[in-house]
Amino acid sequence: MVRTAPAEISRRQFLAAGGLTVAAACLVPRGLCAQKDDLVEHALKEATTAKVTVQTLRHNISVLYGAGGNVAVLTGPDGKLLVDSEIVSSRPNISAALTGINAAPVKQLINTHWHFDHTGGNEWLHEAGASILAQENTRRHLSKDTRVEGWKHTFPAAPANAIPSTVFKDDHTLHVNGTTLLLKHYAPAHTDSDISVHFTEADVFHTGDTFWNRNYPFIDYSTGGSIEGTIRAGEANLAKVTDKMIVIPGHGAVGGKADLIYSGTC
């Protein structure tokens, strides 16, 4: 378990004190903090060889763990739907993991926010036939050069095929593979583009980077993130969670209500 502040300091106090200036050096909980070179470039290199594992959840939903953000996979007669697309250099291992689930094509992709470790696979997945849906600020940030001061890195505008073709402002509902998906925008949270995805029948909840299991999330002030918004997002997640809900965090192991409670009180 990673701790970035003494136990007697609450999450709210830690965030308000600027503790996430330390977390800003970490792209993923697996730890890039010790790297002295460009952290983004290091993550891209790590992703080329990082193992991708598949965890089956329920109701035809699985999660892929790799070098970047956690990817949810919903299968069914409409083809695969993904939530997030990992780091671009992880393509071979992500593709193999998806094929290992079944041979159905990826038809739809939802981005929980614009960061490279959640949208890196957008282009190749779109070229393979997936339509891309996101909150409107994700498209805005991907459409132009965007600087993240916390990572000391400027991201060039994404290729045209990586840009979400359909966007929404606040909340959105989808019906795919016999499942109702509720998409909620947090304004702002760790960016200004964060959404969560609730697979309602399965009661599986993908939080994106509004929740990192057993770690503090990075706040991207450069693209609208805020301390208070991050806290409010955590409170909204906690208010939504049920006793039997499966929670897929942006980073870290799949958890549940106890993990969200821990995140809100530690």
Regions found by a protein language model. Give the residues of each.
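N-terminal secretory signal peptides
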Residues: 1-10, 20-25
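Zn-dependent metallo-beta-lactamase
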Residues: 18-78
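Non-globular, low-confidence helical/coil segments that flank catalytic cores
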Residues: 39, 43, 93, 100, ...
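Conserved beta-strand hairpin/beta-sheet module of binuclear metal-dependent hydrolase folds
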Residues: 53-99, 195-199, 204-207
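Divalent metal-coordination and catalytic microenvironments
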Residues: 60, 74, 84, 113, ...
